[in-house]
Amino acid sequence: MPRAVHAFAWGGTLLAALAVLLAAAAVEGRGPWEGWDEGRELRRPGYAERVWPDRPIRTRANTFSNLAYMTVGLYACGLALSDRRRARLAGPETSAGNVVVATPALSALFGLSCLWLGFSSGLFHASLTRAGQRLDVAAMYPPLLSLLAIAAARALPARVGRRGNASVPTWALLAAVVVLAEIALWRWKWSMSATTVLSTLIAAMALVTVAEHLLWPGRFRSAWLGWGACLLAAGIACRQSDVARSFPVGPDSWLQGHALWHLLTAAALGTLYLHERSERGARLHERSEQGARLHERSEKRESSSDPSASEASRIEGDRIQQERS
């Protein structure tokens, strides 16, 4: 990964943290949330962290831990900019076969969704207002919707409509669907179960990734899925123990169960994005399989009477596997 992407992500996260600290210091003692409708968690906390009703940031750990979503979002946006620059310099053929790399707008869509989640969830945990809660819950969905949009883009043509200038990029239509879905989920937030919607999206994402591995075996790095599943399971465990008040820390600790939920689910979203980004083109995949077959063939022929042919086959297999990497 380019160093500039790391600098972009961590530099942006640091700036966001400084902005929150400066804003909180500027309104300290002024009651910035007065006049806002209180959320249920202000008087009846749903999480174990201590609530400070008179402070600009009413729950510290649960607020600042949302920077993790912003870091993931900034990484995705940074990679989108890097992919766009690389395509301009080296040509679009360098990313042939990888939908995410070839379509920087999809990375930007996912990145902006994570940034929106970090902002909305941070606003809720800082304010504990009803409006903040509505944004927080609705913002949970766009990152998963964006990942589903990436999978859909892989199965659809790059452009939709008539040939020529009249056609529309598929990514633009998918982005519009994600935005409209987010608006609808925000609009009807109070009339639906957030647990049901989120569980449905997670299940849909799981089915889609399994289908990708069945349709295109070997073209994705499945290890990212394993990491994502472990991180999600750990995040759920931390969240549930926090709600049950069984997480082994005090209410003033920065290591809260719900804060770890933010950190771990942000990391899980990052691994799912990297899984979608790990796609290899069909041609490269075929050549890697050919190299593996030549390697196996050379091992079987090591004891044959023609060592030169075995050595040539082994060298050819090594060359193809080096091209793969």
Locate the predicted segments by residue:
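Ala/Thr-enriched low-complexity intrinsically disordered regions
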Residues: 94, 282, 292, 309-312
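Long, intrinsically disordered low-complexity tandem-repeat segments
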Residues: 282-299
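Long, compositionally biased, helix-prone stretches
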Residues: 290, 322-323
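Arg/Gly-rich low-complexity intrinsically disordered repeat tracts
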Residues: 301-304, 324
